[in-house]
Amino acid sequence: MGTLYINQDDAFIGKVDERIVVKCNNKTLQEVPLIHLEAIVILGRATVSPAAIAELLKHKISLTFISEIGEYLGTLEPELTKNIFVRDAQWKAAGETPQAIHAVRGFIRGKLKNYRYSLYKTQGHYSELNLQPAMTIIQNVVNKLNKVDNINSLRGLEGAGSAAYFGVFNQLIRAEGFVFKPRHRPAIDSVNSLMNFGYTLLRRDVQSAINIVGFDPYLGYLHVQRYGRVGLAFDLMEEFRALVVDSVILNAINNRILTPNDFTVEPLSNVVRLSEGGRKEFLKLYEKKKQSEFKHPVVGRKCTYREAFEIQARLLAKYLMGEIDQYPPLVLK
């Protein structure tokens, strides 16, 4: 199963023998053997028994809490791995070091090239769209990355490339009733609501991968250090945004798996919230995407996106520890 999502309000999560049992109103909703679990994600309100928590920690299964509007609340997970050498290399590369600058270039190159790849695929399917100008801007930005030697300037290039992508995002939406507005948290439109939710799920999965490898998730290079921010998780998830989350969102909208009726608007705050049924459908699509296979261009074999999160984390660790000369971002062509 991999990840178990608890989408039922007022659910109770307990342990029976070697199984996790999910109940609501004394009715058993799910029973999953611990051996089949890698993570549990609770969306909304649910109660977890102390026995279940102890068993999850014992089996190194993370427990994540996400609010009903897709806001990441926190994760309970086992202690960091004992690989102090990875964290030592990570900290030594902090700041404006050549390694940090190179890593930031890689994160941004991967993100922008995958943005361009997404636009290229869509343009091929719908010749009436006018995505070429945005693709040209993104490519021009990518071409400038090697000419910049400080992280702040690289961040500026990342912003310019992202602006070109999101500037044509509405052209990628083929269903009525959905309009993308500038990125906003909390979301005040349905597309941003899906993005916030999807990126929260992606952040959790990438953070889990970097924890497995042995990184300190709070020390990133692209994202400015801030108290409580898992900077490295945000860094490494950049190259997966278009490939995983944006792809799932466009699939859900354009194939009418989600409709405007799957969203509600809070009367006072105008925050847009995905319904319980809508969350369930989105989670199905997200898990299916994570389990889908592709040929990884660096390792040269088929893998799932879930496996790719850890592969990229391990490649970054190898680079920082001097085992390889460059960090190769995941780029699909």
Predicted regions: what they are:
Residues 20-21:
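Hydrophobic residues embedded in beta-strands of well-ordered beta-sheets
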Residues 1-16, 25, 31, 73, ...:
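Active-site helix-to-loop segments that bind/position phosphate- or nucleotide-bearing substrates
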Residues 34-48:
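Extracellular/luminal Protease-associated
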Residues 49, 70-75:
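Short gly/pro/ser/thr-enriched loop/turn and capping motifs at secondary-structure boundaries
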Residues 40-43, 61-67:
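Short hydrophobic alpha-helical runs that function as membrane-insertion/retention elements
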